């Protein structure tokens, strides 16, 4: 049988079901002449849940223009699911028929400027959040160069359209379709009274605009980027923008549409 030429990396969590699927899928791919490559793949298949897809994204976040992703779920239905663990034959068949088509979603770019001149740069598929460890966080919010408000509360999160269904949704933010290339700024337990006021609702910021957060105190802040957590002291400002790169998923008949993903994840079957 002729080699397909497609290079594939398989990334799985440590759960027994995911490991079983990993070995089965690896064997089927080899028998069908796919190339297993964990450094320079064409397609990355994450096996597990949405957390595993985030890990796969961050492993290849510097190769986004070259890589396409597939989510294979082994537990309860996940938001980034394209295939279930009993659909391996279907997956291999679709890979054989793959023409290179892709479905693309926006990614968040985060720049943390420290007072010592260092700049830390991150990418997020879902969201990036900032909190203060032990007390109320106070930060000025600047949107596209315009001072907007002084926030007081537990923290703030900035999400992508696909990330709008994650932590952002649990905070009461809106669900945003990924064809709308925008960011969403959502408050975490804001402090509102006769003295201190914030807008009190999520803000949708278009692709060309930039969000800046300027903490007013120089102590430690905790920054979460998807499923990774960092602690920084003496932050000068943080900038959030839509990244120049997108995440690309393999566009096959099994790639679930965004609204079907939302329905399956949060609503389920609707009774007639």
From Swiss-Prot:
The keyword Transferase applies. It comes from the Bacteria. This is NAD kinase. It is found in: Cytoplasm. The keyword Transmembrane does not apply. It comes from Streptococcus pneumoniae serotype 4 (strain ATCC BAA-334 / TIGR4). It catalyses: NAD(+) + ATP = ADP + NADP(+) + H(+). Keywords: ATP-binding, Cytoplasm, Kinase, NAD, NADP, Nucleotide-binding, Transferase. Its cofactor is a divalent metal cation. NAD(+) binds at residues 50-51, 126-127, 152, 154, 165-170, 189. GO terms for biological process: NAD metabolic process; NADP biosynthetic process. Involved in the regulation of the intracellular balance of NAD and NADP, and is a key enzyme in the biosynthesis of NADP. Catalyzes specifically the phosphorylation on 2'-hydroxyl of the adenosine moiety of NAD to yield NADP. GO terms for cellular component: cytoplasm. InterPro entries: ATP-NAD_kinase_N, ATP-NAD_kinase_PpnK-typ_C, NAD/diacylglycerol_kinase_sf, NADK. The active site is at 50 (proton acceptor). Its EC number is 2.7.1.23. GO terms for molecular function: ATP binding; metal ion binding; NAD binding; NAD+ kinase activity. Belongs to the NAD kinase family.
